């Protein structure tokens, strides 16, 4: 799995409320979070399937 999958969920600095998914390294699964729309990090996916393919395997 790519190293960025280990990063925490990062909402970013903007104030949008966009549903997104991130890989939770503690639970070893992808989870939903609210993305602010800018900034953040690479551990952010538009769909849970994309997250699972990239970080779960």
Swiss-Prot record:
Record PROSITE patterns: BPTI_KUNITZ_1 (PS00280), BPTI_KUNITZ_2 (PS50279)
Site (Reactive bond for trypsin): 15-16
Keyword annotations: Disulfide bond, Protease inhibitor, Secreted, Serine protease inhibitor
Domain BPTI/Kunitz inhibitor: 5-55
Gene Ontology molecular function terms on file: serine-type endopeptidase inhibitor activity
Pfam families: Kunitz_BPTI
Main location: secreted
Keyword Disulfide bond: yes
Cellular compartment(s): Secreted
Function: Serine protease inhibitor that inhibits trypsin (Ki=0.0035 nM).
The family this protein is said to belong to: Belongs to the venom Kunitz-type family.
Protein name: Kunitz-type serine protease inhibitor
Originating organism: Naja naja
């Amino acid at each position: 799995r790519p190293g960025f999958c280990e990063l925490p969920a990062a909402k970013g600095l903007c104030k949008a409320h966009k549903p997104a998914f991130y890989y939770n390294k503690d639970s070893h699964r992808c989870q939903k979070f609210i993305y602010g729309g800018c900034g953040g990090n690479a551990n952010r996916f538009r769909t849970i399937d994309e997250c699972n393919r990239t970080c779960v395997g």
